Design a protein with these regions (language model features):
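Metal-dependent polysaccharide deacetylase catalytic core of the NodB/CE4 family, i.e.
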Residues: 209-306, 359-379, 408, 413, ...
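Asparagine-centered strand-capping/turn motif at beta-strand->loop junctions
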Residues: 57-61
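Active-site and substrate-binding clefts of carbohydrate-active enzymes
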Residues: 140-200, 210-212, 217-220, 224-232, ...
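Secretory targeting signatures
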Residues: 1-33, 55, 72, 557-591
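Short, solvent-exposed loop/linker segments at the N-terminal edge
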Residues: 43-49
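Short acidic/proline- and small/hydrophobic-mixed sequence motifs that coincide with surface turns
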Residues: 63-68, 82
Length: 591
């Protein structure tokens, strides 16, 4: 979709700006078509006070809506009526316009979440309805809830072997996803701007090493081979946005407002590598990713984002060996089924997970439901204050049950901002603002929690799994299995080539790098339902060693295979990395 088309779509959506789907188009004498939203003057209320409600009504008809009455009521979680607000009677809304109606009343309610429901009535017939949470909270004697937000930013490498970009999405998603107030922004840049607007908010980010590399490559030597439409080609604006975005994340990290995690460089599904007996490959990718993250961003990353949250217990000693101290897994698919002394305790805390041979890491389990709502529901509500109210209501429930606890929310960071353009961006900005306004809610990075909070809950086992449950999205079905079989064949050949020519040979290092690319999770995700290009790329890099022909009389023969191959990727440096290519991340929405 061109930028002009995207602008038109955004304008239409913003003009509609409501939370209720319209009724069927009206004819003469039928119910009017309206949209409604309800907001409150505060996100959280004390036990007694004054409640102020604003009901926004948008008339989508070409004639004035007259004789409108608005009834507003309050219900508890069991759908019991607990309060009736004053009616707004016999009002009108102009054609194709929006009017706000204010209602206020004194209240006295217990500590709980309620819902305000506003119904629009014409001649005794309901023609529209909307609702919003009403959070009544007693904070006396309760320790604040710590909120740890973790966002994963990932793009695969879109470079071909000549170092040319074949896809524009690194540049577009940094500087060209949506237009706001006459300026184009991308998801990655918007996160920086939100944090600059809310300096009290602390967030943890995984900036995938393959994304960092492409930011760097774009700034140093951008090359475009013409393989995608010229209208999507990165403009000078997008490259400027990359420069500002990189500087922004570096500055935020230096100030302590954000923490930057690392990840295995090419986003492999780590558990599969371990189960296939390729633990040294995982170690190599973690070390390569950490080295690049640390050097490019000026940090010392001690936490790791586990790609796709794909986990198996065999990863614990590997992560510890690579210098990783903590990671994030899923409540529904990992904490449920965990074993150990802490298995029956609250999920709202960090856990020590003990592996083999004395190894251990710290695990934060994300709240699955709230994380999913944040990225799939509260990013597509035309009224940002409603989105923020919904978020605060969900977090307030956790605060009531676990004051002083740690609520971990973890999700993709760019995808939620791509679903509805500027609507998504404004929703999340409102949520950040709502968080900043709550004294009972404090934000923290994972590293700060680890360094300041004793970890007392211990686990001895976490079940295999990913955010989706198992690993079937990446392995199992024949088209996916065939790719893994090609990788397995190529790896066996590469082991023999390494034994013959030596682990330090630059060509051998390059081949291992290509193999690590083939191990990335993006290939299988899009096979077979996606474009054939994904499978083509997978086999191209899975067959790199198979098709390799070494020049004669160049390499020294080494008949003794090294004991492991984790050192092949470590310290490869920019020269070799410049030659690599990866897949389009299948889950990234294309503009």
């Amino acid at each position: 979709m061109s930028k002009s088309a995207r602008v038109a779509t955004v304008i239409i959506l913003v003009l509609l700006g409501a939370t209720l789907l319209p009724l069927a188009p009206s004819s003469v004498g039928s119910d009017p078509v309206i949209r409604m939203s309800v907001t409150t003057d505060r996100y959280v209320y004390p036990l007694t006070g004054e409640l102020e409600v604003t009901v926004s009504v948008t008339n989508l008809e070409v004639q004035t809506l007259e004789g409108l009455t608005i009834n507003s009521t309050v219900y508890d979680s069991s759908n019991n009526l607990v309060m009736v607000l004053p009616d707004v009677s016999d009002v009108s809304v102009g054609a194709l316009s929006t009017t706000n109606f204010n209602v206020s009343a004194a209240y006295s309610l217990s500590d709980a979440n309620y819902v305000i429901v506003s119904d629009a009535m014409v001649n005794g017939t309901r023609v529209g309805s909307a609702n919003v949470p009403l959070v009544v909270l007693n904070t006396a004697g309760r320790a604040p809830l710590t909120l740890a937000m973790v966002f994963h930013m990932h793009q695969p490498i879109y470079l071909n072997l000549q170092g040319e970009f074949e896809q524009p999405w690194v540049q577009v998603h940094t500087g060209g996803d949506f237009e706001y107030n006459g300026t184009w922004y991308g998801a990655y840049q918007w996160h920086v701007l939100m944090l600059e607007d809310h300096p009290g908010i602390k967030v943890t980010y995984n900036l995938q090493p393959s994304l960092l590399y492409q930011w760097n490559d774009s700034l140093l030597d951008f090359k475009y081979n013409g393989s995608f439409p010229s209208e999507e080609a990165p403009l000078s604006h997008d490259l400027t946005a990359i420069n500002e975005t990189v500087d922004g994340y570096r500055s935020l990290a230096a100030s302590g407002q954000i923490e930057i995690l690392t990840s295995p460089f090419y986003h492999p599904l780590s558990a599969i590598l371990v189960e296939l007996g390729w633990s040294s490959d995982l170690l190599a990718q973690i070390q390569l990713g950490k080295n690049y993250t640390d050097s490019y961003m000026g940090v010392n990353a001690t936490g790791m984002w586990t790609p796709e949250m794909g986990f198996t217990m065999g990863m614990v000693p590997i992560m510890q060996e690579a210098g990783i101290q903590y990671t994030v897994l899923d409540q529904a698919n990992h904490f449920v089924g965990a074993q150990g002394p802490g298995a029956n305790s609250s999920v709202y805390q960090p856990f020590e997970l003990n592996g083999t041979n004395g190894s251990h890491i710290i695990v934060f389990f994300r709240d699955t439901e709230i994380s999913d709502e944040l990225t799939s529901t509260w990013n597509s509500i035309p009224n940002p204050r409603v989105a923020a109210s919904d978020f605060i209501a969900a977090v307030a429930n956790v605060y009531r049950s676990s004051p002083g606890g740690v609520l971990t929310l973890a999700s993709d960071g760019e995808n939620p901002l791509l679903s509805d353009g500027v609507i998504s961006a404004l929703d999340w900005n409102a949520i950040f603002g709502a968080i900043a306004s709550q004294s009972w809610l404090q934000t923290s990075t994972l590293g700060s929690i680890v360094s300041s909070r004793p970890v007392t809950a211990k686990l001895t086992f976490v079940p295999d799994g990913s955010w989706s449950g198992g690993f079937g999205l990446w392995i199992g079905a024949q088209p996916k299995t065939a790719i893994w079989q090609a990788i397995e064949k190529d790896r066996a050949i590469l082991v023999n080539l390494t034994a013959r020519y030596g682990a330090d040979n630059i060509e051998i290092k390059k081949l291992w790098n290509y193999l690590y690319i083939a191990e990335g999770s993006d290939w299988e995700w899009q096979t077979p339902q996606g474009s054939p290009w994904f499978a083509m790329q997978a086999y191209r890099y899975a067959n790199a060693a198979t098709q390799y022909q070494a020049p004669p009389n160049v390499y020294q023969v080494n008949s003794t295979p090294p004991s492991q191959y984790s050192t092949y990727a470590v310290g490869i440096g920019g020269v070799v990395v410049l030659a690599v290519v990866c897949l389009i991340l299948a889950r990234r929405r294309r503009p």
